[in-house]
Amino acid sequence: MQIRHFNRLKRSVLLFASVLLLSACQIESQPKSEFEKIQERGVLRVGTLNNQLSYYIGPDGPAGLDYELARKFAEELGVKLEIKPAFRQADLFPALKKGDIDIIATGLNQTSQAVKRFRPGPAYYYVSQQVVYKKGQLRPRDIEQLIEYQASKDSQSEEDVNAGAQTLKIVEQSQYVPTLTALKKQYPELQFEIVGDADTRDLLKHVSTGELRFTVTDSVELSLAQRLYPDLALAFELTEDQPVSWFTRRSEDESLYAMLIEFFGNIKQSGELASLEEKYIGHIEAFDYVDTRAFIRALDDKLPRWAPLFQKYSEEFDWRLIAALAYQESHWKPKAKSPTGVRGMMMLTLPTAKSVGVTDRLNPEQSVRGGVEYLRRIVARVPDTINEHEKIWFALASYNIGYGHMMDARRLTKAQGGDPNAWADVKDRLPLLRQKRYYSQTRYGYARGDEARNYVENIRRYYQSIIGHVSQKPSIDEDTDDLQVIPPLNPELLISGAVETIAEEVSGASDITNEVDEDLDQEEE
């Protein structure tokens, strides 16, 4: 009796053990999530476009809006970042589908075609699709006028019946293909050519040189391109504003997508996203055709002569930023003079020149060295509560109107409920320093704050134009395959843990008060 009981107990134990073993095997055989694979690999593989907005190699290493966001996302995941830049957008989605990259981070429109095949992340800015033409030529103001122009080209060309199609080209697998394809169903006469051996920047250049009549790009890309090709102009808009986002693979596994949602939610709430967008695209709205044409000529005629001088003395600064500052000051004229007494390449006042050891303001080498030293001293005074990448804009405003007036603008910003550590907020208050109702309550009084704002924004535009001009030849060799890993110039930039300081949140007041002054007093000292 005891033996039978023991045997039953033995069988029960063996059965229970078998169930446990089977369960363990099933648990081990469950596929790992996307997020777990990335953690195990220790690397987030990001595909992006090599251009002046998403990703480029600067003097201090990788830069660009999408690069900085991707670096921060990798930090959040606790892994290293591996950037795989492409020259052609057409290479990105196939690489994502094959699993060669984990994310596309280059600001693509959420078109219906892309959304069906891949999962878009949160929108982080908006653009419209625009038809672009060359200033001075026939401007179609809608799709019907464009079709009329193409029809006239067909009738004029006896040798090529497709002459109309060759007037409008777009990039293969771009967000513009489904837009024009849908329009062609509505307007069968519409003609366009899809090219696979060029990117949008190439086509924009061809429009500027007259090799191509029209192309399609987005509103941000056009604004950036106009700094290099001022003849480019908007013909008409094809779409309303559309969301721009990153993309991941579409599957039942939402682990990486969930992390992406949380990441963008956090940086939006903290203001970090707005700060980065201000850094890269906050300056592109205004466009002066005449000034830009003169600047582009100077890039070819004058910059090659003075670039070595800017590179020699820039030290911790990007030499292209120093070049932009010098152009704003003197248009790269070493003998420049002003009725107000400022002189030279960097337009130094006599007291400023003496303070930085400049004995001859009209000597370009002394002027550049002195101007950089003066800027360095101002940057050192800018409060550490301001994000590192925004300090330079506050310093440039101080270079123009004086440090005290810049601090007044910060106090005014805080009093009105803005963030005194965010350039986007402070630059909007600078013009108020002209108005008596505001400057009468400030410490340093009246100032031409609107000129200081324009001064800084001009320098930012010149800076981006120089970046684009210098990098028209790709940062990597043309023979290099797309999506090849580019080793960073500074490996520390790709290691998680180097989290940047986020500007502290500030609660504003409705009036300028002594309390506001006291909060910023220590920073000014």
UniProtKB/Swiss-Prot annotation:
NCBIfam families membership: PRK10859.1
Segments traversing the membrane: none
Cited function: Murein-degrading enzyme that degrades murein glycan strands and insoluble, high-molecular weight murein sacculi, with the concomitant formation of a 1,6-anhydromuramoyl product. Lytic transglycosylases (LTs) play an integral role in the metabolism of the peptidoglycan (PG) sacculus. Their lytic action creates space within the PG sacculus to allow for its expansion as well as for the insertion of various structures such as secretion systems and flagella.
Gene3D superfamilies to which the protein is assigned, alphabetical: 1.10.530.10, Periplasmic binding protein-like II
PANTHER family listed in its UniProt record: MEMBRANE-BOUND LYTIC MUREIN TRANSGLYCOSYLASE F
One of the GO BP terms on file: cell wall macromolecule catabolic process
Localization (cell): Cell outer membrane
Start and end residues of each stretch annotated as Disordered: 506-525
Gene coding for it: mltF
Region (Non-LT domain), start-end ranges: 25-284
Topology of the protein relative to the lipid bilayer: Peripheral membrane protein
Identification of the protein by name: Membrane-bound lytic murein transglycosylase F
The species this protein was found in: Vibrio parahaemolyticus serotype O3:K6 (strain RIMD 2210633)
